[in-house]
Swiss-Prot record:
Protein source organism: Agrobacterium fabrum (strain C58 / ATCC 33970) (Agrobacterium tumefaciens (strain C58))
UniProt-recorded name of the protein: Oxygen-dependent coproporphyrinogen-III oxidase
UniProt: a divalent metal cation binding residues: H121, H131, H169, H199
Active site (record annotation): H131 (proton donor)
Region described as Important for dimerization: 268-303
The gene coding this protein: hemF
Entries under InterPro entries matching the protein: Coprogen_oxidase_aer, Coprogen_oxidase_aer_sf, Coprogen_oxidase_CS
C-alpha cells in the first residue's frame, strides 16, 4: 500500500496519550504471557512428560537509557519451541537516510514509538506459527499500526479452507467490523501483499490483517476510536490463537512433518531479514538486536 500524506501537528495531550498507549502494550504483554503459560500447562499429548515452559523476562536500554528501552519476554517450552512477547518504548532522532521513509520526519527527525511485538514458533508442526504486533508512532504527526498473520507450516494445512485459517480470519473480520475506522477487506489485502516473498513468488502464510498510518479522524472518533480498535486487535489475537493451539497441540506428528516445518521456517527467516519493516526499523533506530532477531526460529533447514 502506498504511504499516505499524514496531517502534521500533535494534540496538546499527546504525552498523556503516549502514557496510555504504553501502559496498554505492557498490560497486553502480561496478559498474553499468562495465556501462553496456561497453554504450556494444558498439554496432554506428545511431550507432555516434559516440564511446561515459563517466560524469562529481561529489560534492555537504548543509548544507556537516554533513548528509552523495553522488556523481552522469551519462552522455550513443550508447546512453544520459541516464543517472544516484547514491548518497547524508544525515542530519539532518525538518521538522515531513514527520515524520508517516515511520515513527518523529514522536517524534524525526532520520534517516539511504543508497541508490542510477538512471534511464536510451536513445537508441534500441526500448530501454525503466528505473528502479531501493534504500535503507536509519533513524529510531527502520529499514528497507529499493527496486524496479525498466521503461518501453517504443513502444506496440507496451508489453505484458505483450513479451519484454523478460517477461524483466524473470522476473528479479525468481526473485530474490524465493530469499528467504523477499520477496513477489513483493505487490511486483509494489505496483509497478503505485505507478507509475500517476492524472490520466491509465494506468500509467507495464509494471511490475517495488516494496517499502518492509522491517523485520527475526528469525524470517526479521533484518537480514542483508533486506540480502542488497536486494543481490540490485541484482545482478538489472545482469544483466537490459543483456540487454534488447543485444537492442534495434542496431535501426533511424523519426521516428515518436522522436516516440512523446518523448511517452512526458512521462509520465515528469509522474509524477516529481507523485507520486514519492523526489523529494519528496529535495526536502523538503535533497537535491541537480541530482541529484534528473537523473531527468528530456533531450528531451521533449507533443502
Amino acid at each position: 500500500m502506498e504511504r499516505p500524506i499524514l496531517p502534521k501537528g500533535l494534540p496538546e495531550d499527546i504525552e498523556d496519550k503516549k502514557a496510555v498507549a504504553q501502559a496498554w502494550f505492557q498490560h497486553l504483554r502480561d496478559t498474553i504471557v499468562a495465556s501462553f503459560e496456561t497453554l504450556e500447562d494444558e498439554l496432554t499429548g506428545p511431550l507432555s512428560d516434559q516440564e511446561p515452559g515459563r517466560f524469562v523476562q529481561k529489560d534492555w536500554l537504548r543509548d544507556n537509557g537516554e533513548g528509552g528501552g523495553g522488556k523481552m519476554s522469551m519462552m522455550e517450552g513443550r508447546v512453544f519451541e520459541k516464543v517472544g512477547v516484547h514491548t518497547s518504548t524508544v525515542y530519539g532522532e532518525f538518521s538522515p537516510e531513514f527520515r524520508k521513509q517516515i511520515p513527518g520526519a523529514e522536517e524534524d527527525p525526532r520520534f517516539w514509538a511504543s508497541g508490542l511485538s510477538l512471534i511464536a514458533h510451536p513445537v508441534n508442526p500441526n500448530v501454525p506459527a503466528v505473528h502479531m504486533n501493534t504500535r503507536m508512532v509519533v513524529t510531527t504527526s502520529h499514528w497507529f499500526g499493527g496486524g496479525a498473520d498466521l503461518t501453517p507450516v504443513l502444506g496440507r494445512r496451508r489453505t484458505q479452507q483450513d479451519p484454523d485459517t478460517q477461524l483466524f480470519h473470522r476473528a479479525f473480520e468481526i473485530t474490524c467490523n465493530r469499528h467504523p475506522i477499520a477496513d477489513y477487506p483493505r487490511y486483509k489485502s494489505w496483509c497478503d501483499e505485505y507478507f509475500f516473498l517476492k524472490h520466491r513468488d509465494e506468500p509467507r502464510g495464509t494471511g490475517g490483517i495488516f494496517f499502518d498510518w492509522l491517523h485520527p479522524d475526528e469525524e470517526k472518533g479521533g484518537w480514542d476510536a483508533n486506540f480502542t480498535f488497536v486494543q481490540d486487535v490485541g484482545r482478538a489475537f489472545n482469544l483466537v490463537y490459543p483456540k487454534i493451539v488447543r485444537a492442534n497441540f495434542n496431535q501426533n506428528w511424523t519426521e516428515e512433518d518436522r522436516d516440512e516445518q523446518l523448511i517452512r521456517r526458512g521462509r520465515y527467516v528469509e522474509f524477516n531479514l529481507l523485507y520486514d519493516r519492523g526489523t529494519i526499523f528496529g535495526l536502523k533506530t538503535g533497537g535491541n538486536v537480541e530482541s529484534i532477531l528473537s523473531s527468528l526460529p530456533p531450528v531451521v533447514r533449507w533443502p
